[in-house]
Amino acid sequence: MIALIAEKPSVAKDIARIIGATQKNDGYLSGNGYMVTWAFGHLIQLAMPEAYGVANFRRESLPILPPDFRLIPRQVKAEKGYKADPGVLKQLKVIKEVFDQCDKIIVATDAGREGELIHRYIYNYLGCTKPFVRLWISSLTDKAIREGLDNLQPGERYDNLYLSAKSRSEADWLIGINATQALSVAAGQGVFSLGRVQTPTLVMICSRYLENKNFVPAKFWQLKATTASGEIRFTAQSTAKWEQQPEAIAALQRVKDAGQLVVKSVERKEACQEPPLLYDLTTLQKEANTKLNFSADKTLSIAQSLYEKKVMSYPRTGSRYIPEDVFDEMPERVALLGQYPRFAGYAAGLDGTPLNRRSVNDGKVTDHHALIITENLPGE
């Protein structure tokens, strides 16, 4: 029997359908020699200071540096402090039972740093020692899943990715816990939350706010002259600027007294502007914020939804490049958009046109290639 664990129930169901695990059970699907179960994102977290004998915020307890970080089920708020999420405990029990009944595990959590951490934390918390392999795919289309299942990767290949995620998780804990307690104790006026990401971000926001608040606009004047040569009209603007209006008026009068402007030289340049690289998550979030006023979280949420609906590749990518084999498929994918009314015009404009290769570079593709459409049409 082979176990397969996905990051979400929806992904687990898609994979289970393809491998023939269609029998529904409480917390997993089974059939055709497989047992397919799932997480709900992060089921396991690092234990809080209380687990190391540190209660309340006390100066003498700082810094809190656990010799070994302990793993506990995800916590939720209770009347007094926190307690393990009952839904998480139930699913962890299911996952353990599935793992215990199987000879090996296929890890199908998201193919990225956090997806790797989700599996490894569960695996380590349960004390599992079964061998596991990795399903590493960049989209959730049936084709991509089948190809991934035919090319399962050794689990140890992603050990460094796990260690990277583990380091990030522990760094967040060390900075967040110690800085929050230190500032709160020093201030003596309640709890002040600090974090590895949130605090530098808040500093940037505050700095920008103060810059805008203290900005004093300064007036200046320039000269402009509109003229024409044949059918070409253009506006010339002085490179000089005057902070006082009388000085600008005096300069304008000198130009008028001269009677005419003479073009002394013309410089011509040929320029070629390359198209932008394909999107990674960051550039997508920036453009969505600029053009649509979307927050970064909203853009990620939409991208994740499109990924789970199988119309877009894996969203949490840091690469703006695609490999040669993916580029070879792009004319067919663009042509498919011609069947979708909203994009038919764009697809027609690219029909028969060689696609630009600026974003094609196997050497610059990281764990995942740039964001692209899949072979599935929206609405299917």
Please give the residue ranges for each predicted region.
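Conserved short loop/turn motifs at secondary-structure junctions
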Residues: 1, 106-111, 188-193, 268-277, ...
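Intrinsically disordered, low-complexity regulatory segments
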Residues: 1-169, 173-175, 354-359
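Generic beta-strand/beta-sheet core signal
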Residues: 5-7, 39, 108-110, 226-228, ...
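Helical mechanochemical/support elements of P-loop NTPase systems and associated helical scaffolds
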Residues: 11, 15, 84-98, 114-122, ...
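Conserved, well-folded catalytic cores of nucleic-acid-processing
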Residues: 18-22, 98, 105, 125-129, ...
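Long, highly charged, low-complexity internal segments
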Residues: 35, 43-84, 192-304, 308, ...
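Extended, highly charged linker/hinge segments and catalytic-adjacent loops that couple domains
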Residues: 158-163, 174, 309-380
